[in-house]
């Protein structure tokens, strides 16, 4: 070829290879060029991406080098040494910053999905959407971390309220069951078996100290599910009480009292008469449990 690369130029080119992260021995410069260009493309691809990350950098310099071949390509690389080195270092730094901040962004999105029914959700969601629209993941100061902290605090308080309500309801139902005469007639083994069968063991503590623990807790049982579990407590304990009666009196008949909205004395008397008739009829067949 008419283009000659001097030993001094080759030394500088090999140093650039090393700086980019592609080892290169003497006389391997042309053979290692595809690996160098692939490495640069990889670095560029990690320096951007889907919002809220910055846009993927343009590859104008890489494409200019790729457009050449042979010694002309080496010369192009040599002439662009400082530019390529700066781009490589900049892309690597940006990629590291993206990798550092992106987990918090993903965690924010995951947690916001659990906050849809909470009052501040619209504000938090709007702020997250602004970060995404403006691709401001790497802005200084960090816009994601404070938003994540606010979302975590909101959800932690909401979950605590649901847990407190569940634990209070559990304690109330447990106290009522322990006062029940039929339940107390059972042996310890029978009570233990019914407790296990009807899932009446006290709920374990729920760890929410870190965003990851909070996420796991909500994924396992979200806010709405805690409400449902609390509402289901009376029926669970009542089922255990009925089972206790069944063990003591196998022929017992369970009677469901009809539910009504009573507006006056006359309706009350009519309802009481209806309930009395229902119970008396069932008593003819054996013991009755209400």
Identify the meaning behind each predicted range.
Residues 1-289:
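Extended alpha-helical interaction scaffolds
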């Amino acid at each position: 070829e008419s283009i000659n690369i001097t030993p001094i130029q080759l030394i500088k080119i090999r140093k650039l290879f090393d700086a980019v992260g592609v080892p290169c021995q003497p006389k391997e410069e042309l053979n290692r060029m595809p690996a160098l260009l692939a490495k640069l493309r990889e670095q560029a691809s990690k320096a951007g991406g889907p919002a809220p990350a910055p846009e993927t950098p343009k590859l104008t310099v890489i494409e200019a080098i790729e457009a050449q071949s042979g010694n002309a390509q080496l010369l192009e690389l040599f002439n662009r040494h400082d530019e390529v080195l700066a781009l490589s270092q900049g892309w690597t730094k940006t990629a590291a910053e993206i990798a550092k901040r992106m987990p918090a962004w993903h965690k924010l999105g995951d947690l916001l999905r659990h906050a849809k029914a909470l009052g501040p959700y619209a504000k938090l969601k709007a702020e997250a959407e602004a970060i995404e629209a403006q691709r401001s993941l790497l802005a200084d100061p960090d816009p994601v971390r404070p938003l994540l902290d606010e979302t975590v605090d909101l959800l932690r308080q909401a979950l605590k309220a649901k847990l407190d309500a569940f634990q209070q309801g559990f304690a109330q139902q447990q106290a009522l069951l322990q006062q029940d005469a039929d339940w107390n007639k059972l042996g310890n083994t029978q009570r233990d078996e019914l407790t296990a069968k009807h899932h009446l063991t006290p709920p374990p503590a729920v760890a929410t100290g870190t965003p990851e623990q909070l996420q796991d807790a909500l994924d396992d049982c979200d806010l709405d599910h805690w409400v449902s579990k609390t509402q289901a407590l009376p029926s669970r304990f009542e089922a255990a009480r009925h089972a206790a009666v069944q063990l003591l009196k196998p022929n017992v008949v369970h009677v469901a009292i009809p539910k009504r909205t009573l507006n006056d004395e006359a309706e009350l008397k009519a309802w009481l008469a209806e309930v009395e008739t229902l119970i008396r009829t069932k008593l003819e067949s054996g013991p009755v449990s209400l």
